[in-house]
């Protein structure tokens, strides 16, 4: 009877540990989750300051300003309807440029400006490096000549 009692207590402790671990994982995931918003969605949502989100859209042409320190940039993200000013301090991806797609991971400050901790430059699925484009063009020309 005592062995049965010990197994029951051990089972209850193991179940409690699994539930506690699951709860802690859920809380940690919720804190790390960053939802994707377009500028229009972000304006409509009236997001609280310091809530991490992913802001996606196009870098507005003529909005990119580089600071003299070489690592800070300011630009506007637009979806064609709304524009949101973004500040970022860090290394800029090679594909980042005006008129291209971008996803900025960060938060709104109490002043209402968006501070990005990371930025991802997006490209369309048809992107090919210049060398590959040249090789494809040469192959196409060769095939047309035959």
UniProtKB/Swiss-Prot annotation:
Biological process (GO), any one: cytochrome complex assembly
Cytoplasmic face of the membrane: 1-7
Location (main, coarse): membrane
Molecular function as annotated in GO: heme binding; metal ion binding
Compartmental location: Cell inner membrane
InterPro entries: CcmE, CcmE-like_sf, NA-bd_OB-fold
Annotated positions binding heme: 123, 127
UniProt similarity note: Belongs to the CcmE/CycJ family.
Annotated protein name in UniProt: Cytochrome c-type biogenesis protein CcmE
Organism for this UniProt entry: Zymomonas mobilis subsp. mobilis (strain ATCC 31821 / ZM4 / CP4)
């Amino acid at each position: 009877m005592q062995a049965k009692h010990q197994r029951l207590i051990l089972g209850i402790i193991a179940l409690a540990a699994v539930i506690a671990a699951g709860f802690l994982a859920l809380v940690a995931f919720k804190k790390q989750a960053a939802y994707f918003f377009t500028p229009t969605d972000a304006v409509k949502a009236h997001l609280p300051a310091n809530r991490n989100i992913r802001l996606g859209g196009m870098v507005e042409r003529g909005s990119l300003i580089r600071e003299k320190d070489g690592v800070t940039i300011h630009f506007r993200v637009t979806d064609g309807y709304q524009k949101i000013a973004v500040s970022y301090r860090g290394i800029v991806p090679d594909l980042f440029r005006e008129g291209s797609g971008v996803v900025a991971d960060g938060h709104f400050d109490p002043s209402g400006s968006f501070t990005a901790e990371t930025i991802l430059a997006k490209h369309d699925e048809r992107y090919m490096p210049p060398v590959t484009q040249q090789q494809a063009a040469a192959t196409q020309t060769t095939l047309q000549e035959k």
